[in-house]
Design a protein with these regions (language model features):
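The beta1-alpha1 cofactor-binding region of Rossmann-like NAD(H)/NADP(H)-dependent oxidoreductases
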Residues: 36-37, 58-69, 102
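Residue(s) in the substrate-gating loop at a strand-loop-helix junction
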Residues: 140
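Conserved glycine-rich cofactor-binding loop
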Residues: 11-12
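Active-site helix of classical SDR
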Residues: 120, 156
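Conserved glycine-rich Rossmann-like NAD(P)H-binding loop of the short-chain dehydrogenase/reductase
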Residues: 25-41
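C-terminal helical subdomain
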Residues: 176, 180-184, 188, 200-215
Length: 215
C-alpha cells in the first residue's frame, strides 16, 4: 500500500513541484488549492505520468469549516496521511509596515500562519495515533531577517519557524518528524501574486541607500 502525502497550495510553484516529486516516489496524493482547474490539470498529469492515485481537495485553507469538513470526511483509503506539506502561502504588496493595506495583512497572516496551524491540528492527531508521520512546513529565508517592504510577510515566516520548532518539541516523545524548509527566491508566480499581476514590478530592484545601508 502506497504512502499518502497531503500538500496544500499544490496547484503551482513549490507545491506543484512537491507533488511531482512525491508522485515520482509512488505516493498517493491529496492535493489542495483554490484553483480547481489547475488542480485538475495537475491530477491528469500525475496520474498519466506516474500511474498514482490523486484526490483533489479544492478549498481555501483560510476557511476553517471547509478545511475541517474536507479532512474529517476523507474516504477511508485516504485517511492515513504519512506526510503533510504545509505549503500554502503568499506575500502581498511591498508597502512600508505603517502604510500597508490591512486586508493584505489579514490575508498573509490568515494564510501563512493561522491556516498552517489549523491544518496541522486536523492532521497530526491521526499521525500520533498511527505512530508515524512527517510534517513539512514551507517557511522562507525571509523568516530569518526582515527586508524593506516585507516586514509582515517576514513576520509570518518567522512564525512558521517558531511553530515548527514548537511542534517538534511537542512531538519529541513520538516517532513523528517536523521539518521547516526555508527556500530563498524561487521562480514561481509568487512575486506576480505579490504585485497583483504586475510582472514588470517583479523585476524592479530596491532603490539604493535604504536606511539599513547607511553608515
Amino acid at each position: 500500500m502506497s504512502k499518502i502525502a497531503f500538500i496544500t497550495g499544490a496547484s503551482s510553484g513549490i507545491g506543484a513541484a512537491c507533488a511531482r516529486k512525491f508522485a515520482q516516489g509512488g505516493y498517493t496524493l491529496l492535493l489542495n488549492a483554490r484553483s480547481t482547474d489547475k488542480l485538475k490539470a495537475l491530477k491528469t498529469e500525475l496520474e498519466t505520468t506516474y500511474g498514482i492515485d490523486v484526490l483533489l481537495l479544492p478549498f481555501d485553507v483560510r476557511d476553517r469549516k471547509a478545511a475541517a469538513e474536507a479532512i474529517t470526511t476523507l474516504p477511508e483509503r485516504y485517511q492515513a496521511i504519512d506526510v503533510l506539506v504545509n505549503n500554502a502561502g503568499l506575500a502581498l504588496g511591498m508597502d512600508k509596515e505603517y502604510a500597508g493595506v490591512e486586508a493584505d495583512y489579514d490575508t498573509m497572516i490568515d494564510t501563512n500562519i493561522t491556516a498552517l496551524l489549523m491544518i496541522t491540528r486536523l492532521v497530526v492527531p491521526g499521525m500520533i495515533a498511527r505512530g508515524k508521520g512527517h510534517i513539512i512546513n514551507i517557511g522562507s529565508v525571509a523568516g530569518d531577517a526582515a527586508y524593506p517592504g516585507g516586514s509582515v510577510y517576514c513576520a509570518t515566516k518567522a512564525a512558521v519557524k517558531v511553530l515548527s520548532d514548537g511542534l517538534r518539541m511537542d512531538l519529541v516523545d513520538t516517532p513523528l518528524r517536523v521539518t521547516n524548509v526555508k527556500p530563498g527566491l524561487v521562480e514561481t508566480n509568487f512575486s506576480v501574486t505579490r504585485f497583483g499581476g504586475d510582472k514588470r514590478a517583479c523585476r524592479q530592484g530596491i532603490s539604493r541607500y535604504q536606511t539599513a545601508d547607511r553608515r
